[in-house]
């Protein structure tokens, strides 16, 4: 048995504290002294560490110690379950009291220590005890199996961010490509590269690869050591001694891309002499790309143009609903193709307008240390201009076809409007005839009543009433048709034409056009307007006004000559006779004036 001498407890080692920390469930700070169990049972296992001078021993009776500073208490207590709570008094508990030391407090910061159960259960508030008793067995077992958290909560966010960045780096998208060396041989087929690897290997920027991934707008980008091309189905990276062809949309069985790979291999394997007109490595690759792009555009345009032309020819013969629907579908396809070809042409045009980019496309010379002036780029400019012309021709042809579709649609609308107007006129004619018959039968309905009309005994009553009804019907029909014809006659120059005189009317049905229906595609309408070929509207109006003024002047001069002749004749009659040779003078003067006019 140990005597109750005053012993100053020593601080436990760091290894022991870490072990107890890993095995304990809670960590608490006892501000006064080591609390002893509040149970009145005599058997409590308690250990008090002693100084180095005195050896510690264990006893079954609690030894009292003198008051000392706040100690650090660590307890190994299992979370009691409802079944084992009744036997908790018979189980020994291990209590360790240690003096507060500097190194122990530095190892376990008290500010971050979670709140734990006190040694005395009764010293806690009632609400905390009730909540503690309501814990489920599953949660307690899970908490005991999990062990204490050896990492502070403040560092969990950093580890979460690190795991997210690591997962993002692991899931970085890869680009599959085929690589050609300086001799045109394929060194890598369907090789996968990360974007970061391509950026570091070829000296690119992330935005450059973003433009390669995009499948909407064509681009030709010139960088200090590479040329990036994104045209239609091709995504190519050109170096001075290497070419990378990226897979189109992740597919390896593209027909156009396969043709391009074979063509590119043949272009790069051509032995170029050092004479005039020899193209460097990067220009041969660029030419292969442009040939593939223009060939694809031409084939696609031929595939779109043929059905459009066939539908347009069919619409000239018969305007059908199905044909109009097919025309709408082909018109949409043609519009999409025209936009695509226009974007390719604009991409080449933008490159031609940048002199610094054209001079920077000489990658072989730059790799050899040769610098070109900004205006010294005749070879690449001629190469790009030739294929720009091809793309421009395709754009113009597709634009002309789109214009033909628009014109055909307008003509079809005009024809359908004319047919609709004809049907409306026919309906109006039937309505006018029905109105005339209804007006005529009104009188017969009046005579059909059983009333006295004072003509029952007359022999001419039936005929007179019938003739009156027919006459009223005819008058109403003729009047209605006349009004309809007057409303149907619509002129672009008004009722009287230009200058109050009507224009030259069309030939009658008995004329040349009788029995012949002109085609709606006729280009000339001079007989309608009375104009000369190639004459503008303002010139035609001016000519018509001058003609009207000349006719008015001729009529005025003729009236003046007639008045002068009548005055001479009256004066001659007043003198009693006219001399010989003067009888026909007025007539001669009239003829002379007419010839002069």
Curated annotation (Swiss-Prot):
Transit peptide: 1-56
Entry GO MF terms: magnesium ion transmembrane transporter activity
Listed Basic and acidic residues bias regions: 581-591
Location of the motif YGMN: 447-450
Entries under Pfam families matching the protein: MRS2-like
Membrane-topology annotation of the record: Multi-pass membrane protein
Chain segments annotated as transmembrane: 423-443, 462-482
Location of the protein in the cell: Mitochondrion inner membrane
InterPro entries xrefs: MRS2-like
The UniProt record lists the keyword Mitochondrion: yes
Compositional bias annotation for Low complexity: 552-577
Coiled-coil regions, chain positions: none
Family: Belongs to the CorA metal ion transporter (MIT) (TC 1.A.35) family.
Protein name: Mitochondrial inner membrane magnesium transporter mrs2
Gene (name only): mrs2
């Amino acid at each position: 048995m140990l005597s109750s001498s005053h012993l100053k407890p020593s601080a436990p080692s760091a290894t022991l504290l870490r072990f107890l920390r890993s095995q304990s469930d809670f960590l608490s700070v006892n501000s006064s002294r080591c609390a002893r169990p509040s149970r009145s049972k005599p058997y409590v296992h308690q250990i008090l560490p002693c100084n180095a001078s005195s050896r510690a021993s264990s006893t079954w009776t609690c030894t009292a110690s003198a008051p000392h500073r706040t100690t650090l208490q660590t307890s190994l207590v299992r979370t009691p379950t409802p079944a084992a709570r009744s036997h908790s008094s018979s189980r020994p508990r291990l209590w360790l009291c240690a003096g507060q030391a500097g190194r122990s407090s530095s190892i376990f910061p008290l500010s971050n220590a979670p709140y734990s159960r006190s040694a005395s259960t009764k010293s806690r508030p009632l609400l905390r005890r009730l909540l503690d008793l309501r814990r489920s067995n599953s949660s307690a077992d899970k908490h005991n199996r999990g062990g204490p958290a050896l990492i502070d909560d403040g560092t969990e966010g950093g580890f979460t961010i690190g795991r997210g960045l690591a997962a993002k780096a692991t899931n970085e998208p890869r680009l599959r490509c085929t690589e050609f060396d300086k001799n045109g041989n394929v060194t890598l087929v369907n090789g996968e590269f990360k974007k970061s690897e391509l950026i570091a290997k070829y000296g690119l920027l992330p935005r450059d690869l973003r433009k390669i991934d995009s499948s909407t707008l064509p681009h030709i980008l010139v960088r200090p050591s590479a040329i990036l091309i994104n045209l239609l189905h091709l995504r190519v990276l050109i170096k001075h001694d290497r070419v990378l062809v990226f897979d189109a949309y992740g597919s390896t069985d593209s027909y156009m891309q396969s043709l391009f790979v074979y063509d590119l291999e043949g272009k790069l394997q051509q032995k170029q002499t050092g004479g005039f007109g020899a193209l460097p490595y990067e220009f041969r690759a660029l030419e292969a790309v442009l040939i593939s792009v223009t060939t694809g555009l031409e084939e696609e345009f031929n595939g779109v143009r043929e059905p459009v032309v066939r539908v347009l020819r069919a619409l000239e013969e018969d305007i059908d609903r199905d044909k109009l629907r097919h025309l709408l579908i082909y018109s949409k396809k043609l519009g999409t193709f025209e936009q695509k070809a226009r974007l390719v042409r604009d991409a080449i045009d933008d490159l031609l307008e940048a002199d610094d980019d054209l001079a920077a496309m000489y990658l072989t010379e730059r790799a050899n240390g040769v610098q070109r002036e900004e205006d010294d780029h005749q070879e690449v400019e001629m190469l790009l201009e030739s294929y720009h012309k091809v793309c421009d021709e395709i754009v113009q042809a597709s634009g002309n076809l789109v214009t033909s579709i628009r014109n055909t649609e307008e003509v079809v609308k005009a024809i359908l409007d004319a047919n609709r107007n004809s049907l409306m006129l026919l309906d109006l004619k039937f309505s006018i005839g029905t109105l005339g018959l209804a007006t005529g039968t009104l009188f017969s309905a009046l005579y059909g009543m059983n009333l006295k009309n004072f003509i029952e005994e007359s022999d001419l009553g039936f005929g007179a009433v019938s003739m009156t009804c027919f006459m009223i019907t005819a008058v109403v029909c003729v009047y209605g048709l006349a009004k309809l014809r007057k409303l149907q006659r619509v002129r672009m120059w008004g009722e009287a034409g230009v200058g109050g005189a009507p224009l030259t009317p069309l030939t009658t049905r008995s004329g040349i056009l009788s029995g012949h229906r002109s085609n709606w595609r006729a280009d000339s309408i001079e007989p309608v307007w009375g104009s000369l070929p190639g004459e503008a509207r303002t010139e035609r109006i001016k000519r018509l006004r001058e003609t009207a003024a000349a006719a008015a002047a001729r009529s005025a001069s003729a009236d003046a000559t007639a008045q002068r002749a009548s005055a001479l004749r009256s004066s001659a009659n007043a003198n009693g006779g006219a001399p010989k040779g003067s009888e026909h003078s007025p007539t001669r003067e009239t003829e002379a004036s007419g010839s002069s006019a």
